[in-house]
Amino acid sequence: MKTLIARHKAGEHIGICSVCSAHPLVIEAALAFDRNSTRKVLIEATSNQVNQFGGYTGMTPADFREFVFTIADKVGFARERIILGGDHLGPNCWQQENADAAMEKSVELVKAYVRAGFSKIHLDASMSCAGDTIPLAPETVAERAAVLCFAAESVATDCQREQLSYVIGTEVPVPGGEASAIQSVHITHVEDAANTLRTHQKAFIARGLTEALTRVIAIVVQPGVEFDHSNIIHYQPQEAQALAQWIENTRMVYEAHSTDYQTRTAYWELVRDHFAILKVGPALTFALREAIFALAQIEQELIAPENRSGCLAVIEEVMLDEPQYWKKYYRTGFNDSLLDIRYSLSDRIRYYWPHSRIKNSVETMMVNLQGVDIPLGMISQYLPKQFERIQSGELSAMPHQLIMNKIYDVLRAYRYGCAE
């Protein structure tokens, strides 16, 4: 990461796409997409997804590392070209506890990530815990981030410190996604970004972390990009020019969260304006979802009723029976919630792919379709871009390759923006 940031600060138009997903097909696509390039691939886990207790994926940081490396070995992607990151590392998962208890767990969380070889660490202590003021004072956020940084430094080896990099600050809203419709978004004021940097510098120095400050490569701000279930707030470069100019006088770049669904031109403009780390997650699993839904429609027409996976019905049943991952985010009317379950840009369906019933139904569908020739006309109907690539000889009509290529469509836009 440090080399890439140095190149950007030297005036090169270069950025990196941060793949924030634990889905094996998304990770496989991200690695396969850059297999024949010289680029490194940044893959990040969030604190609620992967932590010392397993998170919602059931994986510790060491488990996640091995999970990613196993996929890399299968794809033929060199492990040393993978950068592992930890996103929103702090009390995010333990906000219902008092600050002391939550920070104690957060310290162990950061240590677990660093011990597992994660080299890009987002120190985010912005969440209020039980008994805290809402929002937290910037000085408190910075002091807690310094505690987390001290934890990281305490377990890092000399070799790890050479690669270790920190990201500070947080976006609005806090992690978890928009729970209601958005019409506009608050762009971070330069004064607030400067205050975030100033308070963190002061807190780090007070804890004897002056050297660690040199490892702070980025600050998270809101450049004016966001999405909810059916709306996208697109990047308006002119609105972020004050931010773009301010960061030029520092050693850092910006990290932009929720950049999903922007145009490829917007990604290029974001990188030009020093938002050099672009986070993406739901857009990747949304593309995966689109591909699986398309293949399910194809299966419906090609496979005998008694052998069909019933994939779409299974997904719907499971999500209606177990609504904990979408209930507080989606609309309440039955028809509206069904539409959101299937098609929301927030893509809460991503939390359900590991569910045994859904996983089994998708596997059945894939086996069914591997055993038949999918007519080109059906691919044109349901996956038109992939049809064009089959026609030009770039792609085969195998279901797995069709899914990969659909995810590549998202990655192509980021590659354009982060052009190397």
UniProtKB/Swiss-Prot annotation:
A Pfam family the protein falls into: GatZ_KbaZ-like
Family matches, as Gene3D superfamilies: Aldolase class I, putative tagatose 6-phosphate kinase domain like
GO annotation (BP), single: galactitol metabolic process
Transmembrane segments: none
Keywords: Galactitol metabolism
GO cellular component, one term: plasma membrane
Domain of life, per lineage: Bacteria
Associated pathway: Carbohydrate metabolism; D-tagatose 6-phosphate degradation; D-glyceraldehyde 3-phosphate and glycerone phosphate from D-tagatose 6-phosphate: step 2/2
Family annotation (NCBIfam families): agaZ_gatZ, PRK15052.1
Cross-referenced PANTHER family: D-TAGATOSE-1,6-BISPHOSPHATE ALDOLASE SUBUNIT GATZ, N-ACETYLGALACTOSAMINE PERMEASE II COMPONENT-RELATED
Description of how the protein assembles with itself and partners: Forms a complex with GatY.
Function noted in UniProt: Component of the tagatose-1,6-bisphosphate aldolase GatYZ that is required for full activity and stability of the Y subunit. Could have a chaperone-like function for the proper and stable folding of GatY. When expressed alone, GatZ does not show any aldolase activity. Is involved in the catabolism of galactitol.
Recorded family membership: Belongs to the GatZ/KbaZ family. GatZ subfamily.
UniProt-recorded name of the protein: D-tagatose-1,6-bisphosphate aldolase subunit GatZ
Species, as recorded: Shigella flexneri
